[in-house]
Regions:
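Feature detects long, helix-prone N-terminal segments enriched in hydrophobes
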Residues: 1-98
Length: 98
């Protein structure tokens, strides 16, 4: 599950280098979509699995994404590409740590 999150976030990050300011909102919505899907997927896990190491990884990854979405929303409103890239780098570091 966490690997899938990583792959999808890296995909968004690659698009970030190519986008203009109007695309920031689209990419942020895509990131929020990943978060929603992973939260729904976690909710369908059997209760025992939610408490396992895999469930903990999923919760940690979701927490990092929630934090990132909030920060990216603020940055996107200001259209600050450099800060957005710094935040995406932080997201990647946190996901690698999970």
């Amino acid at each position: 599950m966490v690997q899938r999150i990583r792959e999808r976030v890296y995909s968004i990050d690659a698009k970030l280098y190519l986008c203009d300011e109007e695309d920031f909102t689209f990419l942020l919505n895509e990131l929020e979509s990943i978060l929603d899907e992973e939260a729904a997927s976690f909710g369908t896990m059997p209760e025992g699995l939610q408490e396992s190491g895999r469930g903990l990884e999923s919760r940690n990854a979701q927490a990092y994404l929630q934090k990132a979405v909030k920060a990216l929303r603020e940055v996107t409103d200001k259209k600050n590409r450099r800060k957005m890239q710094e935040l995406m780098d932080e997201v990647h570091a946190n996901l690698r740590a999970v």
